[in-house]
């Protein structure tokens, strides 16, 4: 094996991403070296491509980006005993410290010292990736590569959707991006009564409808208050999944929640915004922030879901070779694509 590989690198502190030759990652005794088969482009990768304020203060340059992947074990350190060369794997993109209070209590997703693959340390947009063995997740034979490549965002959706009991509940999802659509489909799979998704992007709403989300609402043309009676809803939504990061959507959600409703918040807002906290108080709402995936319960649950009733393959709208990476980033930056999967 050559000690050099091709990789997509954030090589300059300016918009863009570049294909370069970089050294193959070195592994320590507890690391696994993964030969990448497929990767997917995340919204985080778009932020890094655009070099927005968040990226400028977060990502050191140069950096191999990317954190949505599937591949096979190519090598491993002397202390690794659970994996074998050629085994299909994906992996958790949040590297946690293992020694803080939350890590020691089994709550690794709450680690204060988390490092992000492809953000704070070299990522998956390369021919090889090195991660700690603790972060490696074996992929069952009946899960296709392209589905395993999008487990990171699917995990975000599963973590958000399963934060509260959904059986028999009316669920509002604000934001029909890929993760929002995934969250709506998960809610339907686990027994929600009514599932409504809102957005103002007609392409994304059309994709949500095509994939089988029960009720699709264009918030620029319809008011939720007008839609609810048509669905037989008399009191409000029981559970909200906020996936948009958009102030108007979050305010609509608060307005239409039932008293005692529960909201899981994954969408990241570009800037701070106000909400009416009196409504939160007098409705006695429960708000829960979501970041990443629970380690590793979310992984177990989403693998079980895709082995069963959950089909998210229709969310992949672009399948391209890695040499056409610019086409993939252009599609993601347009805001009108589903998931983009790149073949290495």
Swiss-Prot record:
Principal location: cytoplasm
Cofactor section: Zn(2+)
Residue numbers binding NAD(+): 179, 199, 204, 266-268, 290-291
Catalytic machinery residues: 44, 47
Pathway(s) of this molecule: Amino-acid degradation; L-threonine degradation via oxydo-reductase pathway; glycine from L-threonine: step 1/2
EC number from the UniProt entry: 1.1.1.103
Molecular function terms from GO: L-threonine 3-dehydrogenase activity; zinc ion binding
Cofactor binding note of this UniProt entry: Binds 2 Zn(2+) ions per subunit.
Binding of Zn(2+) 2, residues: 97, 100, 103, 111
GO CC term (a single one): cytoplasm
Keyword set, alphabetical order: Cytoplasm, Metal-binding, NAD, Oxidoreductase, Zinc
Positions bearing the site annotation: Important for catalytic activity for the proton relay mechanism but does not participate directly in the coordination of zinc atom: 152
Positions bound to Zn(2+) 1: 42, 67-68
Enzyme superclass (EC): oxidoreductase
Subunit and partners: Homotetramer.
Family: Belongs to the zinc-containing alcohol dehydrogenase family.
NCBIfam families registered for this protein in UniProt: PRK05396.1, tdh
PANTHER family attached to this UniProt entry: L-THREONINE 3-DEHYDROGENASE
Stored HAMAP family: Thr_dehydrog
Protein name: L-threonine 3-dehydrogenase
Organism (species): Mesorhizobium japonicum (strain LMG 29417 / CECT 9101 / MAFF 303099) (Mesorhizobium loti (strain MAFF 303099))
Organism lineage string: Bacteria, Pseudomonadati, Pseudomonadota, Alphaproteobacteria, Hyphomicrobiales
């Amino acid at each position: 094996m050559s000690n050099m590989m091709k990789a997509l690198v954030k090589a300059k502190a300016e918009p863009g991403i570049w294909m370069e030759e970089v050294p193959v990652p070195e592994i320590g005794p507890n690391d696994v070296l993964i030969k990448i088969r497929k990767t997917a482009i995340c919204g985080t990768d778009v932020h890094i491509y655009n070099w927005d304020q968040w990226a400028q203060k977060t990502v050191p340059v140069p950096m191999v980006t990317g954190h949505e992947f599937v591949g096979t074990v190519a090598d491993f350190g002397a202390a690794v005993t659970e994996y074998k060369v050629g085994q299909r794997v994906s992996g958790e993109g949040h590297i946690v410290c293992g020694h803080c209070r939350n890590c020691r209590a089994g709550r690794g997703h709450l680690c204060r010292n988390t490092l992000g693959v492809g953000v704070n340390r070299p990522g998956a947009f390369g021919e090889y990736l090195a991660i700690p063995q603790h972060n490696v997740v074996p992929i069952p034979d009946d899960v296709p590569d392209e589905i395993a490549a999008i487990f990171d965002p699917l995990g975000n959706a599963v973590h958000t959707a399963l934060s509260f009991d959904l059986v028999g509940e009316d669920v509002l999802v604000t934001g029909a991006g890929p993760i929002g659509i995934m969250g709506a489909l998960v809610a339907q799979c686990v027994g929600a009564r009514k599932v409504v998704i809102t957005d103002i992007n007609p392409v994304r709403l059309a994709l949500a409808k095509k994939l089988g989300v029960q009720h699709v609402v264009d918030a620029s043309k319809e008011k939720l208050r007008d839609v609810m009676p048509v669905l037989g809803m008399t009191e409000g939504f029981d559970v909200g999944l906020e996936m948009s990061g958009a102030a108007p959507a979050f305010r609509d959600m608060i307005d239409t929640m039932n008293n005692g409703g529960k909201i899981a918040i994954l969408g990241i807002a570009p800037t701070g915004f106000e909400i009416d906290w009196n409504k939160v108080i007098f409705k006695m709402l429960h708000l829960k922030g979501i970041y990443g995936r629970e380690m590793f319960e979310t992984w177990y649950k989403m693998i079980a879901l895709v082995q069963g009733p959950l089909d998210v393959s229709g969310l992949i709208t672009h399948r391209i070779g890695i040499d056409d990476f610019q086409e993939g980033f252009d599609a993601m930056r347009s805001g009108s694509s589903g998931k983009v999967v790149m073949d290495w």
